[in-house]
């Protein structure tokens, strides 16, 4: 199902179980910007309180711009990770309001353990991750998102940027199995048709 931003800036309602921000005037402004730039949302969000969202291809800083505009326009409270140092200055307040989670990279316990603990402590959490881990072309995805989803026992929701059609596509839910390599191959196959700003996934 395709959802185009309407002339009045409207977007489809989110499912009840999905984490959401309270209503805010900024949502309409972001929806207007998306409409003016021709971007649209394809697919539907599952009615689940906890999952891992993966976004690809990630080939430009513009991905963050369009993703953030869509997130705010929808009122979707999708969390994301950032290094703890970014939260110490004046930017920290804004990052937290937008769903940022400070990460202790030097902590004794690893990133996966930090996020699994966050899932176990949160009745509602959608965690967004770019599996490529960089805007540069990579031959292999980082597998942290898969390990987080497996350990937290939550599904994976693929989201794909396609610049030629200016769409953000929400894919079908993916249940991680015990086979990391097979799962990564299946997920990358989903992303094969989509084209980022500078390359495919």
Task: Please place each PLM-identified region on the residue numbering.
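Extreme N-terminal tail/first-helix region
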Residues: 2-42
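Soluble catalytic domains of membrane acyltransferases
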Residues: 19, 35-193, 198-201
């Amino acid at each position: 199902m395709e959802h185009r931003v309407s002339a009045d800036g409207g977007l489809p309602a989110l499912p009840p179980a999905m984490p959401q921000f309270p209503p805010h005037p900024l949502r309409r402004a972001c929806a207007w910007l998306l409409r003016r730039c021709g971007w649209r949302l394809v697919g539907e969000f599952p009615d689940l309180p906890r999952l891992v969202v993966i976004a690809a291809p990630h080939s430009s800083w513009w991905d963050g711009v369009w993703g953030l505009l869509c997130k705010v326009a929808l009122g979707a409270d999708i969390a994301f990770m950032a290094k703890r140092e970014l939260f110490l200055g004046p930017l920290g307040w804004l990052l937290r309001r937008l769903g940022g989670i400070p990460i202790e990279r030097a902590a004794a316990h690893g990133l996966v353990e930090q996020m699994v603990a966050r899932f176990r402590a949160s009745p509602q959490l959608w965690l967004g991750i770019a599996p490529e881990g960089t805007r540069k072309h990579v031959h292999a995805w980082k597998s942290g998102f898969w390990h987080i989803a497996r350990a937290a026992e939550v599904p994976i929701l693929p989201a794909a940027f396609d610049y030629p059609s200016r769409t953000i596509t929400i894919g079908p839910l993916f249940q991680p199995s015990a086979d990391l390599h097979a799962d990564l191959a299946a997920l990358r196959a989903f992303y094969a048709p989509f084209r980022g700003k500078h390359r495919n996934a």
